[in-house]
Amino acid sequence: MSDPIVTSSKMEKSAEFEVTDSALYNNFNTSTTASLTPEIKEHSEESRNGLVHRFVDSFRRAESQRLEEDNDLEDGTKSMKSNNHLKKSMKSRHVVMMSLGTGIGTGLLVANAKGLSLAGPGSLVIGYVMVSFVTYFMVQAAGEMGVTYPTLPGNFNAYNSIFISKSFGFATTWLFCIQWLTVLPLELITSSMTVKYWNDTINADVFIVIFYVFLLFIHFFGVKAYGETEFIFNSCKILMVAGFIILSVVINCGGAGVDGYIGGKYWRDPGSFAEGSGATRFKGICYILVSAYFSFGGIELFVLSINEQSNPRKSTPVAAKRSVYRILIIYLLTMILIGFNVPHNNDQLMGSGGSATHASPYVLAASIHKVRVIPHIINAVILISVISVANSALYAAPRLMCSLAQQGYAPKFLNYIDREGRPLRALVVCSLVGVVGFVACSPQEEQAFTWLAAIAGLSELFTWSGIMLSHIRFRKAMKVQGRSLDEVGYKANTGIWGSYYGVFFNMLVFMAQFWVALSPIGNGGKCDAQAFFESYLAAPLWIFMYVGYMVYKRDFTFLNPLDKIDLDFHRRVYDPEIMRQEDEENKERLKNSSIFVRVYKFWC
């Protein structure tokens, strides 16, 4: 069957350039040719010198690297494209496991302890259910945009500049970069808190140094090391979540531990909501909302893999379905089970004010019921999970920073890619930011955790709002310019109204979080400036960058005119007739399949 994809006339045809190591290989051969003598000892010594020289030489700038500027956009937006690309050395097994496990870290495994302590299990479940709907709407919007613009430089970070405004794009993209920059020290701090479950008198800096050096070693030796370590880390995380679900059900039913049947005991005593007035309980739900955004953070990254799929029209619905299962099983189900097995007044939960406030609720779900050995295994896997997210942050942040430099949004000196495909200067900058993690040895460890987690959580609100608002603007621009949606390869199941709801809900969360930050829970309704900036720092930071870009560039465009948006820039246009023919053939093929195949296709 013919290909349904018709390339637009305005779509760029930039030739890919593969950075090779031929020069290094020739240098290596030159340096070792002289060693081919009868003396085996001399040959061995020269070979070792050649390997050392090759490793050192790999840190030099890739000779072919240069930037090309494209001014094709009608609204004047420039796309800075490099004709080299970062090395892609990961295999399909790496990508599959990362899509399942990446993002399962501090937000889900540790930060929810404070939410459970302050708000109770009822607020925890309500907050996660509400954010789950927005997550699905965002995934649908991102899927439609990703299939339509699979090769757009900057991917979903570029949507804002094209469909909204350049100032909105600058502020949101930089905040997204800052989010990943803060994740590294955040995870290092969390790792020290996790270790304190075993020994709370140990110097946290010892483990911070070990984990920090380990992460630097991985990333300065290339992407292959990152791919293999992430495959192992994510495998452990998925197995732990599956085992935790089974264990929690067994404990609750009285099959393990010393408490017998638990059922909904903790929802009655100490209760499903934390003590206090109705306003305090509502504040608890508002607090959980931002915590949930932090936990769901990273799920939007599935869009990045769309341009690597042979048939995005078919793979995107599959990815959307899997995101639903990830939401229902990994997030909602585990939150419900934690609420059933961990009382919210336990003094080991972070934020409870107890003497040992460093335990994850996943660990407490087993340890407080006197289940032996298992809590230590869970805590060890949580430690692996935390290091895994720090590993991902040190992989994503430098590449995002390098991309910002290529687009003209960051200093050009950060656009340095060495011969092994490492964004070297950006990697050094991100590594220096990780030094913030050494505050773990100070008494302000939990306070630093709150600051960093708040930046990351609110950043997701801006990023997701940008994706959904760009989707709305894309649909409107298509209508204004007389384009048919039949040209779109994948249309969001939730339509444009899902994006409207998501943007509206995010605005409500911003306002609710402002209230909670200004008058935090447990402060007697009094305002607290320090607590406000701890919880709401990302918002004034975004406003500063948004206004600063407007003033500096003297560009006060609030929204790009719909009729001026270049819809064809890096757009993939599909033939409606061929798509209908494909859909009919797929329906007929599915109709003639076995019941097992039909069930599988329906659910997966």
UniProtKB/Swiss-Prot annotation:
Coiled coil: none annotated. Its main location: membrane. The keyword Phosphoprotein applies. The keyword Acetylation does not apply. It is found in: Membrane. One of its GO terms (biological process) is amino acid transmembrane transport. Residues 1-95, 141-169, 228-238, 306-323, 399-423, 471-502, 553-604 are cytoplasmic. Keywords: Amino-acid transport, Membrane, Phosphoprotein, Transmembrane, Transmembrane helix, Transport. It is a multi-pass membrane protein. Involved in transport of isoleucine, leucine, valine, cysteine, methionine, phenylalanine, tyrosine and tryptophan. Belongs to the amino acid-polyamine-organocation (APC) superfamily. YAT (TC 2.A.3.10) family. This is Valine amino-acid permease. It comes from Saccharomyces cerevisiae (strain ATCC 204508 / S288c) (Baker's yeast). The gene is BAP3.
